[in-house]
Amino acid sequence: MAKRKKGMTFIPYDYEAAYNKSLEDMNEFFVEQMFKHGKKVVYALKEIRAGDQFEVEIYPQFKKMDEVPPEGRSIKKDNDKAQRNLNDKNARKYVERLINENFTDRDLWLTFTYDNEHLPPDGDIDAAIKNVQKFIRRVNYQRKKRGLPNARYVYVTAYNPTEEIRWHHHIVMDGDMDMDVVEGCWKQSSRNEVRRLQKDENGLTGMAKYIVEEKNRVKSEKRWNSSQGLRDPDIKVVHSKRPTAKAGGYKKIGTYVETMRKGHEQVREQMLEWYPDFDFTDAGIYYNDFNSMFYIRARMRKRRQQ
């Protein structure tokens, strides 16, 4: 792979916010004109592997913030573990990927609520989180009695004062201990739901999106946390690739953007050339007329063995 030249230091920015206009809203003539008049720029390709899910994000990189579309000038990290508030979309994406990387359909999805006697004070999310922590301590006590290690988990605490159920917790946990024993460790209500996780074609992404999405960002709050020792999603960024997985010379990612920005079919074809062990799921092509550049995302999944 060709090495990047020294001095090519790029600034971080929110490329998903910067390029938020779908190419489907433009006709082919304007797409061609925009590409012709766009400045030459370095494109990066980010690969994110999480369990059997695989995502690709292609975006332009810049050296100066004034080159970035205004919508994208806030700086966020994809996997900033200190960002525990799920009002931030990058935190939501990270939690979705963390769940896909660490859990399977052998594991558990728990939803716990409160009866009136045990409701946390309105708005006191820290008090609600303490209840989850007590639950986890009880779970780990029961696991120790059975010779099991501490639980692996990700939990989301949600509060919305306008909902009938103002407080609830979603917990994704390994399924090494009996479900009834796990449920019995929650003492704040008997109105709970405990079930095995079920993967679909997008792995656990649908379930993960459900528990992290915000219905009302102004009045509601969601906070997440996880056990120690979970595997991070594997993230790799490159600036050049071969035309196919194992053939041809390396070309800059921008060369492929010239073809892929023409439509979803072109994106699908290129992804299957690059990643033949994966099935294509979906893609999106976005632009910003601030600088006539593109952001392309694709989702794939590991091909199942026949």
Descriptions of predicted regions:
Residues 1-165, 175-306:
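Right-hand nucleic-acid polymerase module
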